Amino acid sequence: MSRNLSEQPYVHPSAEVTQSTLGRWTEVSERTRISDSSLGDYSYVMQDCSLWCTTVGKFSNIAASVRCNATNHPTWRPTLHHFTYRASDYWEDASHETEFFEWRRSNAVTIGHDTWLGHGSTVLPGVAVGDGAAVGSGAVVTKDVAPYTIVAGVPAKPLRERFDRKTADRFQALAWWDWDHARLRVALDDFRNLSAEEFLEKHGG
């Protein structure tokens, strides 16, 4: 990622983005597939990822080989195979099962602002990852992740909070991710050098 980004999203030629919206200063890397999703300003998705029916906030850091909304199969039916809901692929006189796809879409994934999804992690349908949360490499996230919480493992479990709850609440109230590009540049040294408490005190959180 050693290129100059801009308000125009960057999508690698080998990536595929369909029926989705990409914010300003965003980047989609090699061989990644994004469909029916949205990517907030400044967020990036590294190589070989798959996002479907997922809303990603601003400043999200998505490492390589991440899967968001790994779709479910019908475990309650006599067969798991998709011929039951993709029937028109197999028979000219059969149709796809609209209700099944609507059920899948009703279990969208939400990824908050300033989040980090580690390499090879998977976020299952219907899960929400809160603002400021981090997901460890290889984790399988089956339940909602609280804001500013670090989770890891299979299934993912909380390891610790990034900050105490009061500090986390102050960051969410500050909502620095909504600052404009010029203000972010002015605060760059503070992001780099101040502690969380010092940053909040200076910037009114």
Q: Over which residues does each language-model region extend?
A:
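ABC ATPase nucleotide-binding domains
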Residues: 183-203
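Short, charge-rich, low-complexity interaction segments located
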Residues: 154-163, 167-168
